[in-house]
């Protein structure tokens, strides 16, 4: 199973305010990504997504499976995701390395997990179960976290690398999340990147953070900050060009603003291609 069939260019996270404009104008968007769960109930949103998938390569990005939870993935959720995959034939499917549920409770958030051998065994089982249910490889995204577990036995990059080795999954590298963790927690981002097998990185995310009470918060509500652009350039120099996405989920701007952000990333990707 290949990691993705996304083109090696920059795309955008396509959100509801832009569906009709995008479908009417058919701009050059590279590729688009949507949140999987928004389409589980079918109806008009799914009909719209089918049209989107006919126009641009599509990535399905999940926020609800919680593969880092102790409880197994919800069977109903997996079944809904499989139906969506079958109906839209996405170029990539991804989830977060986070937890959000127990057998009788669900939290609508992306919560961090401990990077221990015990957690690794649990998550690897859930990833394998998910890939078997979907009949394809998924990408796992690194998380923005605001706490660290004192019993961590490895860093996030080492944990993801082990998941890649055990399950054959890929990595969705969120550069903004990694930068936020560097500032908030003092994460050694060089060590995280060094631990990740470059060939396993199938996609990159870029987004804007907010500052709250001296911390950086991954809100996806602003343009990509200059510091993150510089970090992105470092990452691309290190691993080579990768399909890259501009995420913007709150205070969503005009579509043209997203296209302008994507053009910045594309210029960096193009420069890397010229040097290679």
From Swiss-Prot:
SUPFAM superfamilies with a match to the protein in the record: Xylose isomerase-like
InterPro entries recorded: MbnB/TglH/ChrH (IPR007801), Xyl_isomerase-like_sf (IPR036237)
Annotated family: Belongs to the UPF0276 family.
The name this protein goes by in its record: UPF0276 protein CV_3513
Source organism of the structure: Chromobacterium violaceum (strain ATCC 12472 / DSM 30191 / JCM 1249 / CCUG 213 / NBRC 12614 / NCIMB 9131 / NCTC 9757 / MK)
